[in-house]
Regions:
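Conserved small/polar residues in nucleotide/adenosyl-binding loops
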Residues: 208-217
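Short coil/turn segments that connect the beta-strands within blades of beta-propeller domains
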Residues: 43-44, 96, 142, 181
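A short loop-to-beta-strand structural motif that recurs across blades of beta-propeller domains
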Residues: 60-62, 107-109, 152-154, 201-204
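Short loop/turn segments that connect beta-strands within beta-propeller blades
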Residues: 67, 113-116, 157-161, 207
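Post-signal peptide N-terminal segment of secreted/secretory-pathway proteins
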Residues: 63-132
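Beta-rich, blade/repeat-based domains predominating
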Residues: 83-94, 127-139, 170-180, 186-188, ...
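Bacterial Sec-dependent N-terminal signal peptides
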Residues: 2-5, 15-46
Length: 219
């Protein structure tokens, strides 16, 4: 079971530290009114993403406020009155939003970091309705890019929160980053390794110019 932590200094996001841990968290006494309280936006906060158990639909997002020393273990559920989904795999902040990649549920949960409220649950589904199984997210110039195990990268507009374009890459991509106006996607081939194809030891490079990514390369 994996947890990802994001440490935020104030609403201006002047510093962010991400790390992974597997230590248990103890529940703290809940104080009414702290959830989504906009008066806390000037304090430091810690967000903890727990992917939960595979196929158990028990992913969670916890929040710790350093200002009042309060922990809400399942912060997302407390605010939105529903669970986060099955196997939350990645979390990142861009602008005023938290983006959570929920792998088995095949969704991208977009959350207002000031209030914890869900702004949109983006369904990552293929045309035939099958799950794309999103894995990781990166950002560039008001766009979010999500790589999925079905061998695709989706471009999401961070204002409308709609999927604008989908591009094919290698087998089971399992990492994505931005550098020098390019997207780099590591392809794993991990899901069909036993079929005799072996690993996919390639990196896809996408040159993204308006209106959509193009010129896919492998190396």
């Amino acid at each position: 079971m994996k947890r990802k932590l994001i440490y935020i200094f104030s609403c201006w996001l002047s510093s962010i530290i991400l790390f992974v841990a597997c230590d248990d968290m103890e529940d703290k006494p809940f104080t009414s009114g702290i959830i989504g309280d906009p008066t806390e936006t000037g304090t430091a906060e810690l967000y903890v993403l727990c992917e939960g158990l595979f196929n158990q639909n028990n992913s969670s997002l916890a929040r710790f406020s350093f200002g009042n020393q309060q922990m809400v273990r399942d912060y997302f559920k407390a605010v939105n009155r529903r669970g986060l989904g099955d196997t939350a795999n990645d979390m990142a902040i861009y602008g005023s939003k938290i983006y959570v990649i929920v792998n088995i549920s095949s969704t991208v949960e977009v959350i207002d970091f000031r209030t914890g409220s869900s702004l949109k649950q983006i369904q990552m589904l293929a045309e035939n309705g099958s799950s794309r199984q999103p894995r990781y997210i990166a950002f560039h110039k008001e766009k979010a890019y999500v790589c999925s195990y079905d061998g695709t990268v989706a471009r999401i507009d961070t204002t409308s929160l709609s999927i604008e374009a989908i591009t094919s890459v290698g087998r089971n991509p399992d990492g994505i980053c931005v550098q020098n106006e390019k997207l780099y996607i590591s392809n794993s081939g991990g899901l069909d390794y036993s079929s005799g194809l072996g690993v996919d030891n390639t990196v896809s490079c996408l040159l993204y110019t308006s209106p959509s990514p193009r010129d896919r390369q492998k190396s």
